[in-house]
Swiss-Prot record:
Pfam families, alphabetized: Ribosomal_L16
Upper classification of the organism: Eukaryota, Sar, Stramenopiles, Ochrophyta, Bacillariophyta
Gene of this entry: rpl16
Gene Ontology molecular function terms on file: rRNA binding; structural constituent of ribosome
Principal localisation: plastid
Superkingdom classification of source: Eukaryota
Location(s), subcellular: Plastid, Chloroplast
SUPFAM superfamilies linked to this entry: Ribosomal protein L16p/L10e (SSF54686)
InterPro entries given in the database record: Ribosomal_uL16, Ribosomal_uL16_bact-type, Ribosomal_uL16_CS, Ribosomal_uL16_dom, Ribosomal_uL16_sf
Descriptive protein name: Large ribosomal subunit protein uL16c
One GO biological process term: mitochondrial translation
Species: Thalassiosira pseudonana (Marine diatom)
Amino acid sequence: MLSPKRTKYRKYHRGRMRGKATRGNEVSFGKYGLQALEPSWITSRQIEATRRTITRYTKRGASLWIRIFPDKTVTARAAESRMGSGKGAVDYWVATVKPGTILFEISAVPEEVARAAFNLAAYKLPIKTKFIIRKDI
């Protein structure tokens, strides 16, 4: 599972996701990309499950880039605990994703294989996604 080695703060505010992604919204490493169409938090477990699905389908013949990183903590209280006494313990890590963010990139495989791999990978994610092809400059 992905998580930062160290952070400035242990616990974060939830914040809110407004607008579209202005950075990380173009395919820059691979030839094909998986783009988010909705705002959401994507957990490190979901990222790992998606990565495994893509690598298994491509039989490890593809180069894969994970363009998001879970750098925000989500806290949870113990079950049946009373209110008060501070914020709960860190439960898991999430990546904040806005619409337009490129989640994964892939290269060194045919377009049909990449499309099928990303289609399978999309089932592991809690958001709608879109397959995109790199625009050559």
